[in-house]
Amino acid sequence: MLLPKGAIFAAMLTLTIGSTAAQDARPVDQGQALVNMYCADCHATQATGESPLAIAPRFGDLHLLYDVSFLSEALVEGIVTAHPDMPQFEFDPEQAAAIVAYLKSLEPKE
């Protein structure tokens, strides 16, 4: 069966767009898994909700405190805070980028 060139092009375009969307979602999903694994004991890791530890900021509010784009370097070098309850974490650059992608996904859409 022969398909018109337009149908082949449309099918290829659909596959490309679908593949790109899946690749874009992957870092956000990875970041969400990482924060749920390492941060959820103390922080609300969703856009809303209360943190289990009162002094731990909700991740949905981090953009109000920091430009989350700059957190990637701190996540790789190790975040150290003034309060002793927070453990020091060090992530590899891919993990840090995924966490930042997830945090950005929590910011309100303008």
Regions found by a protein language model. Give the residues of each.
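Bacterial N-terminal signal peptides
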Residues: K5-G18
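Electrostatic cytochrome c docking/interface patches
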Residues: L15-L34
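The canonical Cys-X-X-Cys-His
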Residues: G31, N36-T45, I99
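Axial heme c-ligation environment in periplasmic c-type cytochrome domains
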Residues: L53-D61, A74-L106
